[in-house]
């Protein structure tokens, strides 16, 4: 056979032609520069006579390993007499290979490092002092599995004496039935260890859905850091999944309690990731370090401290131990919205350690329904700092969404007064990382600015109220010239878009303008034409797109795309009226809001109507596929990441079937495990697939095989229907990814393809 032509022919992967391959090569180099930008995740401050020492936890995508590389960066903080502050950084960061969690002790003299195994090996606990490893304990699987470090059930807490650490870990595997070579059942205590025996599967146990596949029940443990002895805490019903444990104050020889959040999962465990509407409470159980191991658990009963409220999480004790503070998502639990406006509460903690039969819950921050223009819109937090207190003992610092930004607030626990600690004139997003006395160490970023470390010194304003003077900290983090060049010409602003459907039945807060973050190049329109525009839609729908830095979106901006990042009604940060206006109207009100924002940009002359694309994931993918069906001539290309395309087929296989009912009907009363024909008809009617006959927009689909939230079959059904119609589609499937599609290689390949796909139809 003549093979003379094969040497010059190039092997191209599916879907590539030589021109596209060249573009892949060009775009991949720039994208990698952006992907390499590290995240500043956490910080700890250690005080000494010579000043404060800061330790920062950072993470960076490792494309080769397809994991995040974690490392520590440390520096000395010196406050100068002229009110300036200097950070003196260590010359190099230190990689923390295999470390799952770092937890300094209250004094700062010890550091706990936890290393979770990737198999059935023991979990490692390491106790470090300032110069060396003091102790190392290996906790076998028969005691417990991996420690929870998920940011939700996660809770790792030192006691005040620094002799014990309480934490949440997977309970040990429950025994499975064993059968011999003939198939006969073998009793658990059987002495017959004959060859050929095998284990069955045993009873199925429900998990907490997306991101928790294969994870066992979270349970509470205490380790003695001197002896390494681990004690499982008895008396907690298995129907309660525990998390977020802290120690109660230990004063006057009073009894000490473990205080934690608990989620009930006795009837069904719905998906809990991103879902604040799962009922939960703050519990307390007494702990005595010299407790005999055979004591009856009833001698130390569990106390529900928040019986009168449907939600309680993130427990924190005030510095003086007088108050227990917690966050509540009762509005989400009571309404059914998966996230809604939160509230903050406090409980008086008894100095004698004797818990009353019922506790008086005091409201500190109540739910805001209709915020006045420029005023506090309500509380939207994902968690609290481990030590969020100023020196006065009653001022708590937290980070929350405030319209299209994230801000830092100071909350007076006694009066409930809320004041903004981050600059009130800043449209950047701010996140408090740690407190240095009354000063704040924070990170700030915007869609066009990489994350920067900030240091805020507390002072008083002209009215005598607390205010913070912020300093820029010269970070040792270096960014590539290509990244800085790509960002140098970018700018952003927040657009207010008046809504059109101001009906009488609409709540007042739902009549306010929506917001959209417009990101563009200062060089746009130099040739009289606007850059192509990407309409960017967040998921949820009860989530928000803040003015913060995203590596991948900044990459798309740097290659010539303007962005319109739309916070439609139903988003967080705008008060409860606006949020609750969407349920029952998904696929309609949110679609109209998105089209309104796009048309507003066109009318302002900042968008070319012939070069508009749309990008969204999850509910943002729901909106993306709705938009190309309801406005088939509006968008030249689309990209959807794990989109909801058909609620009727999703409801029976998702980990959150309640979401389908709530967003379709607007309340919880219709929920059932057996949807009726009428339910399925309504779901179909409100889904993008009901508009598929009108779709003609070329669409890229990015799907994760392990997605439990919007299982891959939902996207495939829509894709095949488009192919049947002859619509151009491209599909990328990531076999080891779940809903977020956030593994480094997946994130990289996804946005590389999004860029090339959009370039093809916008003719960049």
Curated annotation (Swiss-Prot):
Keyword terms of this UniProt record: Cytoplasm, Hydrolase, Nucleus
Recorded consequence of changing residue 707 to N: Loss of catalytic activity
Database matches in Pfam families: APEH_N, Peptidase_S9
pH-activity profile: Optimum pH is 7.0.
One annotated GO molecular function: serine-type endopeptidase activity
Description of how activity is regulated: Strongly inhibited by the serine protease inhibitor diisopropyl fluorophosphate.
UniProt cross-references to InterPro entries, sorted A to Z: 6-blade_b-propeller_TolB-like, AARE_N, AB_hydrolase_fold, Peptidase_S9_cat
EC number: 3.4.19.1
A single Gene Ontology CC term: nucleus
GO biological process: protein homotetramerization; proteolysis
Chemical reaction(s) catalysed: Cleavage of an N-acetyl or N-formyl amino acid from the N-terminus of a polypeptide
Subcellular location: Cytoplasm; Nucleus
Keyword Cell membrane in record: no
Assembly description: Homotetramer.
The protein's role, per its UniProt record: Catalyzes the hydrolysis of the N-terminal peptide bond of an N-acetylated peptide to generate an N-acetylated amino acid and a peptide with a free N-terminus. Can degrade the glycated RuBisCO (ribulose-1,5-bisphosphate carboxylase/oxygenase) protein but not the native protein. May be involved in the elimination of glycated proteins. Plays a homeostatic role in sustaining the cytoplasmic antioxidative system. May contribute to the elimination of the oxidized proteins in the cytoplasm.
Protein known as: Acylamino-acid-releasing enzyme
